[in-house]
Amino acid sequence: MDSWFILVLLGSGLICVSANNATTVAPSVGITRLINSSTAEPVKEEAKTSNPTSSLTSLSVAPTFSPNITLGPTYLTTVNSSDSDNGTTRTASTNSIGITISPNGTWLPDNQFTDARTEPWEGNSSTAATTPETFPPSGNSDSKDRRDETPIIAVMVALSSLLVIVFIIIVLYMLRFKKYKQAGSHSNSFRLSNGRTEDVEPQSVPLLARSPSTNRKYPPLPVDKLEEEINRRMADDNKLFREEFNALPACPIQATCEAASKEENKEKNRYVNILPYDHSRVHLTPVEGVPDSDYINASFINGYQEKNKFIAAQGPKEETVNDFWRMIWEQNTATIVMVTNLKERKECKCAQYWPDQGCWTYGNIRVSVEDVTVLVDYTVRKFCIQQVGDMTNRKPQRLITQFHFTSWPDFGVPFTPIGMLKFLKKVKACNPQYAGAIVVHCSAGVGRTGTFVVIDAMLDMMHTERKVDVYGFVSRIRAQRCQMVQTDMQYVFIYQALLEHYLYGDTELEVTSLETHLQKIYNKIPGTSNNGLEEEFKKLTSIKIQNDKMRTGNLPANMKKNRVLQIIPYEFNRVIIPVKRGEENTDYVNASFIDGYRQKDSYIASQGPLLHTIEDFWRMIWEWKSCSIVMLTELEERGQEKCAQYWPSDGLVSYGDITVELKKEEECESYTVRDLLVTNTRENKSRQIRQFHFHGWPEVGIPSDGKGMISIIAAVQKQQQQSGNHPITVHCSAGAGRTGTFCALSTVLERVKAEGILDVFQTVKSLRLQRPHMVQTLEQYEFCYKVVQEYIDAFSDYANFK
């Protein structure tokens, strides 16, 4: 029996005894006295009216109920008092005795108190005997005195009872709190995230422990406190975030993994320490004659307000691909979310469980590829699956969509949550309402998988309750699958994604709504002097430039290679060129890789070469096989050099091992096209490079219309299709303002053509995270919107969107 239950019984007993003693009055009283003497002899009790209590050592009040009733162990207690006659000091003594009440109301001690304990006296005698005495009923004066004492004793007993009750309550609270912290007990009800309780049979499964909404160290956060709290917890190298993550329970319940641990199933597990719990694992339909064929390393996971919204699974192994597709079919899944690459750091993370093209049969499931769309952060594959077997009773086909997030780095987490939020939005929009659980997997099915699940749930909670409970939700889903959200970096990334969504929201637009949006953002915002467009750009300029992540560009040897000291590439995406033999610090050029719509590193955003960096510029072009150069500045503007001429006006010119020859020059309406033959004399190889020199950008401001920009973007994309999708080198003077505007427009227009959707704000925001000051002015930002609107108006295919 639990200790707290024993305390309840004990306390109840004490209260009952105390209550009985305090509320009964008898006509006759038996008094027991301790006598300080070497021999115990009877002594007459003398009536002391002046101080009746001084002569009483123990007072027992007889109950009024029927005579000849035996009370069961009762405690007689003697209290210290001084005898005014003989100066003896009486010491407290407690004895367990049985007492019989005689018909005349006198006390008849059983066995003459033979079990009474003796204790040393505090008086002068060397030895002391404790001798209980029985006194006959005294006269009326004694009875009156004792009646006067009864209310005092009743008050004392009542106070003692109250103290006992308070003590028991405190002990029970402490025991209960301790049990909650240990979180090891079973529960007979399942606490859903929306507050409903679903009853289950006792002892059937270990269920989720409830997380109290109050009295918790990491309670839910209101969204308006999110930014402040994240900044506080990220201080001192994420110290508080690490503490919060480490406080998460590894498993809030006592769960078993018996099925996963069977010898027949061990080979089906990718990692020996990542096993599904028995109570939440996905059960496959057993295959006749195949033992333990109901097992797969996958677990049901709750969403915010939806039970078993997800199935968290490990990345299939070669020997479990058939089981994976069997699970997809049996669970009526329509959406698969993959958050790993097939190989990372040369290690297999997941078997390819789909054909590249055509169809393939996995067990009794035929999978055919219907469509593949490759984007910068993820790939979307559409499969048609069908159960095969009895050809006379063919099952209907089903459409399965796989969303494969490809931007998760081998180490850590994505440097920005923008891509993950776009990915998640696409998953939410495409999963049919009728479908079964969404299958989410990475390699182990816990780290990145858990991160995706938590972001999804917390975005739902944010919209519904205007608060988030990351700690509580991670704790709950860890009771369904171990180690969900595996690292503190993933835990911080969840908060960053939530903050990103809270601060900037969903800024995607259908092309049909662009005109209305433009009218709206030109209106003044109440309470401010800015319109909506100015507020958008203000948010962009508030993005912190990470000067501490520009180490190489700030080295003394490289400072002279920078045209503008405020625009230096970040370390994580700077373009690296081969080091010259015997020369240090020769791998630097002021240029950054920039992601496009469909692929990473689509562009190289570079400053206009200085005279002493032309060789480095061409070494970069050669090393990264760039076949298209976009120049957005004149060599000189307003009497200042903006870019050194890095190509010959005619003939050829050498820059170190690189020679450049002008083969052809053609003037177009707003730009010049130059075909250059570039040769690496050391490698004895040549390449054709095409330069697009845009003349439509005035020295001050922006182009008068977007026609020229639309034209040059189309020409560059055509060149890319012919020469291969190597990076497009884009430069102006500093490689930020006009360069960023070109990259933004090229990316936005490509998405408009593919999806009919645009997001100018997030596109520019992403550029600024990759290189400082991309799209440098409000005019340039506004120009992006105007060019997109012109593009939609100019092309009939997109004019139909209206």
Swiss-Prot record:
It comes from Homo sapiens. The keyword Transmembrane helix applies. Keywords: Cell junction, Cell membrane, Glycoprotein, Hydrolase, Membrane, Phosphoprotein, Protein phosphatase, Repeat, Signal, Transmembrane, Transmembrane helix. Its main location: membrane. Residues 79-115, 123-141 have a biased composition (Polar residues). Pfam families: Y_phosphatase. The active site is at residues 442, 732. Part of a complex comprised of PTPRA, BCAR1, BCAR3 (via SH2 domain), and SRC. Within the complex, interacts (when phosphorylated on Tyr-798) with BCAR3 (via SH2 domain). Interacts with GRB2. This is Receptor-type tyrosine-protein phosphatase alpha. It is found in: Cell membrane; Cell junction, Focal adhesion. It catalyses: O-phospho-L-tyrosyl-[protein] + H2O = L-tyrosyl-[protein] + phosphate. It is an enzyme of class 3 (hydrolase). PANTHER family: RECEPTOR-TYPE TYROSINE-PROTEIN PHOSPHATASE, RECEPTOR-TYPE TYROSINE-PROTEIN PHOSPHATASE ALPHA. Integrin binding to extracellular matrix induces phosphorylation at Tyr-798 which induces PTPRA localization and recruitment of BCAR3, BCAR1 and CRK to focal adhesions. The chain crosses the membrane at residues 152-174. Changing residue 798 to F: Abolishes integrin-mediated interaction with BCAR1 and BCAR3 and reduces interaction between BCAR1 and CRK and, BCAR1 and SRC. Abolishes integrin-induced SRC-mediated tyrosine phosphorylation of BCAR1. Belongs to the protein-tyrosine phosphatase family. Receptor class 4 subfamily. Residues 39-59, 79-146 are annotated as: Disordered.
